[in-house]
Amino acid sequence: IVITGCAVNQSSFSPSKKYSLQQVQQDYIVYQQVLEKHHPSLYWYTSKDSMDYFFNWGKEHLKDSMTETEFRKVLTYVTSKINCGHTSVRTSKAFAKFNDTIRLGRMFPLSVKVWDSAMVVTQNLNRRDSILKRGMIITSINNKSSSAIVDTMFDYISTDGYNRTHKYQTLSNRGYF
């Protein structure tokens, strides 16, 4: 007789886990040093003076008790200023695994197509919603214009040079956020 069992290991990851100021400062130092020593085109599109400004901006925005999402927001903002489409900040493996199991109520339910001055619903993940249908033009969300939302999100997306097409495509493919 063979008896087998299957146990599921409950993940100990929590997206609300807080990291100390010392932890995020140490990680930020490593992040900056790696970019400054090994990035082949750190100053192609952004001058050293400007990158120093953005690195300092990032340091100033580190605070005690940051979640991974809050820390990554600082890193993605600074990284986007390099203007290198091959340089980006990803979630930890644990966070990515958590995202694969997230419920609809905790994520933005719409897929949209974004270009110059328009944002259009391409899919609504909430099948019970009969208002936001495919093809609907979004002019604002929570009283913030779609163009203001796009401009804010652009600040966190890396791209080659000053190319905006990739940023529109990233938003249109549910990427990055």
Can you say where each PLM-predicted feature lies in the sequence?
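C-terminal motif of bacterial Sec signal peptides marking the signal peptidase cleavage site
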Residues: 2-5
